[in-house]
Amino acid sequence: FYHNRLDVAQAWYQKLDAFVGEVSQRVENWGGKYNYLIMSDHGFTTYQQKIHLNRWLAENGYLTLNNGSTEGDLSSIDWQKTKAYAVGLNSIYLNVAGREGKGIVGANEIEPLLAEIQQKLMGWNGPDGKSVMQRIRLKHEVYNGAYTRLGPDLVIGYAPGYRASSETGLGKVPQNLIEANHDHWGADHCVDSDVVPGVIFANRDLQNFGGVSFRDIPFLAIGKHLGQSHIKPPSHV
């Protein structure tokens, strides 16, 4: 993850490419027909700026610390005066009454408050004059199923060059808003998903899987129609 060691990434790509070739050759030597898929769930990118998201929430009036403190962590937050908080690298939660232990945001406030925070964050520019955010989505726009309710109220998609700080991930509230990243950890995938798409390689025709996702893996890998490339993916899994 070192900023100045891109040669390491290239070397590993070469090793992995050789490994894939070796596996493919061994399977081919077994004889008969075979299929293989190589997928990743995300890509990778560098980031130069660390975002302290709870500091932004504090400066914009959504989060208040106890006793006039200028920095702290989750235990330092005055929950009776806090409407939103960040914990995790890409998450904002509202302090919802009846859900959080000391929630104050009523049901009728949730939708307009989320829209307000979303709009303000999308208008936030960093030191380079560019937007800090690439995209911000509501939980139901990202997740589906029985556990959607457990997801963050806003899913934060940082723009290229920006990423949440480790302090944000732990729910801390530092004094700074944005900090230059001089850490050895200089790259990962914790930005907007469109910035770091995954990849798929296959030795079969995937023309009917234009928007292929991980939900298609069982259908592609273990079904009785494995060799029938004309079969379309299921509409719902």
Give residue spans per PLM region.
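Generic recognition of short, well-ordered alpha-helical segments
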Residues: 4, 48-52, 212
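A general alpha-helical scaffold signature found inside nucleotide-binding enzyme cores
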Residues: 11-18, 52, 216
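Secreted, luminal/periplasmic, and some membrane-associated catalytic domains
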Residues: 22, 27-171
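Non-catalytic, well-ordered alpha-helical segments in soluble enzyme domains
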Residues: 96-127, 204-206, 210-236
